[in-house]
Each structure stands twice: as structure tokens, then as C-alpha cells.
UniProtKB/Swiss-Prot annotation:
Belongs to the somatotropin/prolactin family. It comes from Balaenoptera borealis (Sei whale). This is Prolactin. CDD domains: prolactin_like. GO terms for biological process: female pregnancy; lactation; positive regulation of cell population proliferation; positive regulation of lactation; positive regulation of receptor signaling pathway via JAK-STAT; response to nutrient levels. InterPro entries: 4_helix_cytokine-like_core, Somatotropin/Prolactin, Somatotropin_CS.
Amino acid sequence: LPICPSGAVNCQVSLRDLFDRAVILSHYIHNLSSEMFNEFDKRYAQGRGFITKAIDSCHTSSLQTPEDKEQAQQIHHEVLVSLILGVLRSWNDPLYHLVTEVRGMQEAPDAILSRAIQIEEENKRLLEGMEKIVGQVHPGVKENEVYSVWSGLPSLQMADEDTRLFAFYDLLHCLRRDSHKIDSYLKLLKCRIIYNSNC
């Protein structure tokens, strides 16, 4: 569902509609990333002990994101909006490479590839929607494009199968974690900004 019909000039969408769409999208992305992680885990990670190796060192860890709802509630909504944008931007590059590398996998399972493609597309749409929200909540504010650089591509291309599969596992684990955070923060923001915290 495009936010504005193509060719529409001065199209205005209410802030509530923008938030509704963003929450639906973020929830969908989180569901897809959970399904993709579970599929990968079932197909490639069984018996390899990846879960014990998956230290919580996602490339987005440098962005100081709140760990839970209680922490998130202490953060001013402007900061929360910036964090969401930062996390979304931080995934542009890894999602692009994830799709490319999954395509190159032997017998790349469609269940994983199709979800990776969808998540990459939906992440861009959610980022676009968030930028529109920022435009309405803080008109005229120049947004700092803060994001974390991902340097995990060489690991996804390793010749050693175990190392390579673990790199995929770790990336999908982080994607699931971050998509859950974004989903939670967005619901919190919608409650705060649209419903004046009465929800």
C-alpha cells in the first residue's frame, strides 16, 4: 500500500495513519524475521551449537537502544524516533547482502530467500514512513543520519561452511532482535504521540 498514489501532489496523510501503517509494517517485518530465523535454525543450525556461540554482539549494538519497555518509556520520543531511524538505516546494507548471499547458497530454500527479499523491501518502506513521521512530528528539523556500519560480508562468504553458516545465523538472530525492538518502540511512540499515553 503506497502512502500516496503515484503522481499525487501535496498528498497529506494524517500522523495517525502514518503510525498505523508503520506499526503494521514493523510487526510484519518482525514476524518475517522470526519465521526466517526459525527456518534457518531448523535447516542449518541443528546440532552445531550456534545458540551458545551467538553472543549478543549485533552490529547495531553501538546504537544505545533501550533493552526493554521500561527503559524505552524513560526516553524522550525525539530520541526514540532517531534510534528507530538509526536501526532501520543500519540494516539497509546487511539486508541487501543477505538477499545476494542467500541467492548464492546451494539449494537456497525459497522459504528463507523469499522472506529475505520481502524484509529488505519492507525495511525500505518502513524507513520512508518513519521519515514522513519525522517530517510531521518535527517539521524543519534536519535529521542526523546516524547508523551503524555493518562489516559482516566477508563472514557470509567464508569457504568454511561452519563459519559461514554461523555468520548467517548470527545475522538473522540480530535481525530478529532488532525488528522486535523497532516494533516495541513504534507501538510505544504511537501510544505516546497519538493517544497521549492513554493506552
